[in-house]
């Protein structure tokens, strides 16, 4: 039985994209499997708990998927071995104008926060800010992880109970700042300008 990591995920962005994300799993609670599915060929392979391929079939799977079984594939692509557990929708709001939507979820994951899965979700749902806060009391660590459009905006992991000061209460403002930052970064990239101060 694993240690459980407690997660809170705030998702904010354009109403259509945020609702598309919510609708992808609301009936099944298969948060990652419905968006970043485990390759069918690996789903039935018994976990070997060894990263070293030891057979021709293992070598073939590793070449094709970067993993020899479902366990290592999920660790690499979701950041956790199982999909989420104990999902709760804790908040739902908008900006009052009908164009932005905000959801906040609580859920558990096995052993660790699903950072890579959240980053990959942010690639699938454009201009949506994913802000994950987590705590793993068994191993005494906590932190946060923010990303948008597949780019990690900020992250921090510390020993538990040191109190994270960076937690925000205003997700709408945070979303607008993150979107503006993304636009500035895209302008720099598109114009071929490198900012040496970053």
Please tell me what each predicted stretch does.
Residues 1-198:
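Intrinsic low-complexity, intrinsically disordered or marginally ordered coil/linker segments
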């Amino acid at each position: 039985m694993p240690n459980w990591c407690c997660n809170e995920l705030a998702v904010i962005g354009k109403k259509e994209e945020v609702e598309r994300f919510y609708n992808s799993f609301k009936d099944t609670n298969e948060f990652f499997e419905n968006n970043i599915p485990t390759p069918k060929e690996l789903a039935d392979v018994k976990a070997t708990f060894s990263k070293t391929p030891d057979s021709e079939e293992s070598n073939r799977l590793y070449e094709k998927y970067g993993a020899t079984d479902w366990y290592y594939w999920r660790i690499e692509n979701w950041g956790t071995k199982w999909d989420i557990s104990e999902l709760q929708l804790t908040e739902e709001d908008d900006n009052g104008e009908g164009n932005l939507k905000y959801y906040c979820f609580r859920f558990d994951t096995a052993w660790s926060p699903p950072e890579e899965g959240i980053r990959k979700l942010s690639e699938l749902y454009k201009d949506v800010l994913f802000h994950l806060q987590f705590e793993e009391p068994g191993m005494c660590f906590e932190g946060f992880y923010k990303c948008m459009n597949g780019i990690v905006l900020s992250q921090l992991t510390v020993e538990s109970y040191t109190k994270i000061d960076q937690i925000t209460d205003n997700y709408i403002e945070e979303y607008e700042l993150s979107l503006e930052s993304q636009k500035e970064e895209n302008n720099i990239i598109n114009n071929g300008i490198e900012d040496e101060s970053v």
